[in-house]
């Protein structure tokens, strides 16, 4: 299998899908990444854990409808061109 731009885009789509389906109460809370975790004090830089949680929440909020559309396009392309 050749490494093409389509393969790279499909891999990125799979990674974004993986982030989007993480359920906060079922999975993230069990590993200590739930919403009840403290952010930190005033004036402190947010840690990597809080930044990753913010990224996951943002992807789940913003990318819901675009992911449905992009996944549909990817399925149609796979059905048409194999």
Curated annotation (Swiss-Prot):
The keyword Endoplasmic reticulum appears for this protein: yes
Cell compartments where the protein resides: Endoplasmic reticulum membrane
Record-level GO cellular component terms: COPII-coated ER to Golgi transport vesicle; endoplasmic reticulum; endoplasmic reticulum membrane; Golgi apparatus; Golgi membrane; membrane
Keyword Protein transport: yes
Biological processes per GO annotation: brain development; cell maturation; chromatin organization; endoplasmic reticulum organization; endoplasmic reticulum to Golgi vesicle-mediated transport; gene expression; glucose homeostasis; insulin metabolic process
Membrane topology: Multi-pass membrane protein
Residue stretches spanning the membrane: 2-22, 62-82
Alphabetically ordered keywords of this record: Diabetes mellitus, Disease variant, Endoplasmic reticulum, Epilepsy, Membrane, Protein transport, Transmembrane, Transmembrane helix, Transport
Tissue note: Highest levels in heart, skeletal muscle, and kidney.
Protein function: Regulator of endoplasmic reticulum secretion that acts as a key determinant of brain size. Required for secretion of extracellular matrix proteins. Required for correct brain development by depositing sufficient extracellular matrix proteins for tissue integrity and the proliferation of neural progenitors. Acts as a regulator of the unfolded protein response (UPR).
Clinical note on disease: Microcephaly, epilepsy, and diabetes syndrome 1: An autosomal recessive disorder characterized by microcephaly, simplified gyral pattern, severe epilepsy, and infantile diabetes.
Protein family (similarity comment): Belongs to the YOS1 family.
Cited PANTHER family: IMMEDIATE EARLY RESPONSE 3-INTERACTING PROTEIN 1
Protein name: Immediate early response 3-interacting protein 1
Organism taxonomic ancestry: Eukaryota, Metazoa, Chordata, Craniata, Vertebrata
